[in-house]
Amino acid sequence: MKSQWKKLGLAGMAGVLALSAQLAGAKELTVGYVAAGMQYPFNVAAARGFEAAAKEAGVKAVVLDAKTSVERQGNAVDDLIAQKVDGIAVLPIDAVVAQSWVDRAAARNIPVVAVATQIGDPQKHSIKDVYPKLAGLVASDEVRAGADAAQIAARLLPKDRVAKIAIVEGAPGYPTVWQATKGFKDGLEKAGIKYQIVASQPTDWTPEQGESVCQNILTAHPDVDLFYNQADDMVIGCARAVRAAGSHAKLVSRGGSKLGINAVKTGDVDGTVCIQPGKMGRLAFKTLYAAITNPGAPKGKFVDVDTPQVTKTSLSACVPEW
């Protein structure tokens, strides 16, 4: 009997030693996150969500800031590849250029997850048609978000004549700009709204540019009925321009930021669509971690983050994350 216990004890000890050796030899995972520009609250929220999820999982996260430079973002991805990180998440500035970065990482068996923005030409591929070399894409369907904004707008626009609409775009190069515009127009047509786009101008995603663009549009088209801003930051500036001009133009936006939700609450903005960058960041890490720990998992996964509409009567639909 003693001999049997001794054998069991030795076997147990051997198991413990084997497990200890395995743990000692286990590699600490390191993942990289490349932001488009940390001067934007949206980007900060997405990066923080990613970092928080990585910390909870005991994974080291390296966050790099491209400062809105496509070249700098590409170099950051290349640096992470050279460092042989276990995985990379990126919020791409230029969706088409970013395709080559994903190709280079895939050639070295480093999984990549795109955050908020698809990889590839949005005019040739729907957002759900995920670039096959990506481990996954975590984003909101921006065409749907544009249609959500159109539903809000349709309730505000005149029905007895052609409505005059101006679009305040985001920065050139972002696929979101084209997707949000397409969704908005499709949504208006589905609602049976007769409309004319009297102006559509790009910005740099800032309140200052939003105000400047709206001032210029109001000068050229003082009778504009509605401004569709493609981010809450711009709509804050646009609201200032509308008030200063004494205009009665309605304001619809996209974002769900703290500033945007508060502007809806106070009545300065008529409605917005809730985008959740923090949630995207957290889900991006989860998707990347799954790809790292299960290399055989299917690639090209689309993780859709919903986009609830927010008006004065539905403020609780969105918890601001940026």
Per-range role (PLM):
Residues 1-12:
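Bacterial N-terminal signal peptides that target proteins for export
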Residues 19-26:
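Sec/Tat signal peptide C-region and signal peptidase I cleavage site
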Residues 30-57, 62-79, 83-85, 90-95, ...:
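Extracytoplasmic "Venus flytrap"
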Residues 42-57, 145-149, 175-194, 209, ...:
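Short, solvent-exposed amphipathic alpha-helices that sit
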Residues 73, 135-163, 210, 256-260, ...:
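Hydrophobic alpha-helical segments within soluble ligand-binding/sensing domains
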Residues 93-107, 183-184, 198-262:
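Hydrophobic alpha-helical
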Residues 101-144, 164, 257-265, 269-270:
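Flexible loop/hinge segments that line or gate small-molecule binding clefts
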Residues 124, 168, 172, 191, ...:
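Hinge/cleft segment of the Venus flytrap/periplasmic-binding protein
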